[in-house]
């Protein structure tokens, strides 16, 4: 189950200027909803949601929202895409007012999917990685900039990396860890990617 902010059938009806700003709290509202549906015998989702395996994911400002809600004890893992916490809380309206202290609230494994040095969030993300020493964390970079590979067919090169992370961390498929861990990992052997990992028991 994927809980996201907004309805797909509204996208074509809204121009760029009319797009609504969202809050991280809306993600937790969505999580509250699906977990309640999981308990309701009248819901099509009754008994179908694994409540102990929840990923918080987001891109750019949404990545900051993903970090912000990762303090919630129900969040199992975090995926931060093309994002990183600014050195000082942003004064920009609508952007999560996070400080680097938010990184201390991670309590599960974290994956960063970044666009390399040309990604506007690159320096912030690399600083995040350097600061996190209490949970397993992976930093991946593909030199595609801040827009990532989302517009490419099937989400492009980011997709197999994200799926391998979810398979490994949420589904317990240990073979998927081969994407990330060890000198012979899939991403280590791919010259297009760079990867750093730490805090894993190997």
Stretches found by the model and what they are:
Residues 17-52, 56:
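Alpha/beta-hydrolase active-site loop
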Residues 58-62, 66:
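Gly/Ala-rich beta-loop-alpha elbow adjacent to hydrolase catalytic centers
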